[in-house]
C-alpha cells in the first residue's frame, strides 16, 4: 500500500479545509469512517454506541463540499488523485472484505 493524503472540505467555507496523511490507503479509508463516526457522536451525544448503514456514510461523503485522496504511485513517485466515487467504492470493498473474513 502507498502513502495517502486525504483532502477534506466539509462546507463551502474555505476555512473548513483540512488534510491528513496516512501510511496507506486502508488507514485513510478507516480515517474517513472515523470522521463520520465523530460527526454522528456530535449529532447524538447521548447515544453510547454508534451504528450506521453504509448508505448513510455515502450520503455523508456526498454532502461534503470536497473529499479527495492523493495516493502515491510507487513506480512514478507521483500522487494520483481520486474523487468521492473512488472513495465510496474503496470503502465498500474494504467493508465487504472485512465482513467476508468474519465468516
Swiss-Prot record:
Gene3D superfamilies: Enhancer of rudimentary (3.30.2260.10). InterPro entries: EHR_sf, ERH. One of its GO terms (molecular function) is identical protein binding. It comes from the Eukaryota. The keyword Cell cycle applies. Keywords: Cell cycle. The keyword Cell cycle applies. Homodimer. May have a role in the cell cycle. Belongs to the E(R) family. This is Enhancer of rudimentary homolog. It comes from Caenorhabditis elegans.
